[in-house]
UniProtKB/Swiss-Prot annotation:
This is Alpha-2-macroglobulin homolog. The keyword Isomerase does not apply. There is a cross-link at C16-Q19 (Isoglutamyl cysteine thioester (Cys-Gln)). It comes from Pacifastacus leniusculus (Signal crayfish). It comes from the Eukaryota.
Length: 32
């Protein structure tokens, strides 16, 4: 479940959630 909460943590402070999601998405899938 931490994979679902983690994106919110770095999406809010960075502000550019869309760009970060594209860069972090591959890493999130690897963590699974």
């Amino acid at each position: 479940s931490y994979v679902i909460t983690t994106p919110k943590m770095w999406v809010m402070p960075y502000g550019c959630g869309e760009q970060n999601m594209v860069n972090f998405a591959p890493n999130i899938f690897i963590m699974e």
